[in-house]
Design a protein with these regions (language model features):
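Short hydrophobic/aromatic beta-strand or adjacent loop that forms the aromatic wall/cage
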Residues: 49-51, 80-84, 149-153
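Short, solvent-exposed loop/turn segments at secondary-structure boundaries
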Residues: 44-46, 78, 111-114, 145-147
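Conserved beta-strand segments that form the floor/walls of ligand-binding pockets within enzyme
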Residues: 33, 102, 136
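Predominantly the C-terminal beta-signal and adjacent terminal strand-loop region
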Residues: 97-98, 119-160
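Short glycine/proline- and aromatic-enriched beta-strand/turn motifs that initiate or cap beta-hairpins
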Residues: 27-74, 153-159
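Gram-negative (and chloroplast) outer-membrane scaffold detector with strong preference
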Residues: 53-133
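Extracellular loop and loop/strand-boundary signature of outer-membrane beta-barrel proteins
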Residues: 39-40, 72-73, 106-108, 140-143
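Cleavable N-terminal export/targeting peptides
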Residues: 1-31
Length: 160
């Protein structure tokens, strides 16, 4: 009987948290991006590794976003699923083509799981009011491997 009471309380708590979460989120809070490309080791730039990444962003304003990221990367024939906390800043230069800076810090799950960080930048090419084409490049560092990778990505950003 006690277990049933705990389950009811947990269900009520979940419902309240769900309602509060969607009550305070602005209408344009569902901003997503998806990117794909390559990530090459800095020491051997000619060896290509596939890299796919995406983010769910929460807009602070039109120029700054915080969010969570994840994806799939294959680095030196080892598959990883990176999960990260992320920051995106559009620089106030231009109207249709905006330079951006991005940073991620997180954990790579895989055979050689480890912490990682990435820093990069690129271009946010406005497609319309709610979408953009992304061209991104940057540096990614793996903690246990003690080496860096250069990544090049292209993708799309959708602000709903």
């Amino acid at each position: 009987m006690r277990e049933k009471g705990i389950n009811v309380k947990l269900a009520f708590l979940k419902a309240v948290l769900f309602a509060v979460a969607f009550a305070v989120i602005p209408a344009n809070a569902f901003t997503l991006d998806a990117q794909g490309g390559i990530a090459n080791r800095v020491s051997s730039i000619s060896q290509f590794n596939m890299s796919f990444y995406g983010h769910w962003w929460f807009p602070i304003d039109k120029m700054t976003f915080v969010g969570v990221g994840g994806g799939y990367e294959e680095l030196d024939n080892v598959g990883y699923v990176p999960l990260s906390a992320s920051l995106w800043v559009r620089l106030p230069i231009g109207r249709q083509v905006l330079p951006v800076a991005i940073g991620d810090f997180g954990y790579m799950i895989g055979e050689r799981h480890q912490m990682f960080w990435r820093a990069g930048g690129g271009l946010d090419i406005k497609n319309g009011d709610y979408s953009s084409i992304l061209l991104m490049a940057g540096y990614q560092y793996l903690h246990h491997e003690d080496r860096g990778f250069v990544y090049l990505h292209a993708g799309i950003l959708v602000e709903i």
